[in-house]
Amino acid sequence: MRNQKVNILHMGLGAFHRAHQAVYVQRAINAGQPLAIAAVSQRDPKVSEELAQMGFKYVVRESDASASRDEEITSIVATYFYPKDYEKLAQIVADEDFLAITITATEKAYLYSDDLQATLPGRIAYLLHQRYLKTKTGIAVISCDNLSGNGEITKGLVLKSALLLNDGGFVEWVKSQVRFPNSMVDRIVPAPKDSGLLITEPFMQWVIADDPIKKYLSGVGVQFVSDVAGYELMKLRLFNAVHSALAYIGELQGIEFVAQVIDDPKYLQFVSDIQMQAAASFTVPAGESASDYSAAIRKRIANPTLGHRSQQIAMDGSQKLPHRVFKTINELIEKDLPFNYLAQLLAIWVDYLAKSDRVNDPLAEKLIALAKAKDVAGLFSLPDFAVKLNPAAFKSISAELANL
């Protein structure tokens, strides 16, 4: 283990973090930056324990049809399980030299509870309060989850949770000294078969709104930009949305991997059609091309070496689709532009909910009952969704469902 004090705490010790943020930090370390990550598992201590047993060393293999490349990662120097280790985590965050909390906890983690230790935002509020009590130096809290405006969402929930501590000075400190830059991350990382070897694609991207953390992460491929929004929307609407579509098709057709689904010309065309319509809903960042980006996404998904399972991508649709599809349809309706392929995507989701015996979703019971009844209006009017879908879309979704 390197003799470097932990200065980054990562909430969400999954395969994605280990094949993405930890790789960027490793490359920064290789370039001479004094960085070290403590990574936190919040659901199951098994991953934390396995990484510790491996001496906090593992291999990331970048692979495509033409070649593969291995990289040893040692940027994670400690692992913990929350809530068991919350006191140790508080000590880490309270250290004067601590820099940032980063997060990959999936969309469903962004909830509020009046039990401070029950949710991700509450836990972050608690850790920040422990820092506030020891030092008033600010830090960054960087959400890397697939939420548009993830920094603002995180800040709002952390501030709401902070009110539970009845410390007005702390709330003001969070507002003025804790930074919540928006960020966008991208890399296809399937669930690993071996915790010591993560297989991923050569492509990797991390875009962060301008922040002092740039001092440590510049020069290793992290992009610091004035506005992340365009990059977020490209990823959510041109990549994540079609990834979901392919996953539901795969589950319905009994096709194990999304690369096999997109290998079918009719599904490849469907993906292209979704991307074409979605691209009309927003403006891409300067220097980017929606058509080139979309084509690159199709090629990346088709990578046959990744083994990315339809079942893995299909889970938690109620948490993903509002951000990936609902907002897009709403904006296309406002612009009086066609959205039939996106309506078809949602119809396929409803069909999957009605027919699959492998639905894994926090709203599964409600969704399945409504999907089996083909109650499109009832399903998409549920108050549980983070984004309300414009009811003007219901008729189109029903028509697409009838045509499946």
Label each PLM-derived region with a short phrase:
Residues 1-404:
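Substrate/ligand-engaging "lid" and interaction regions
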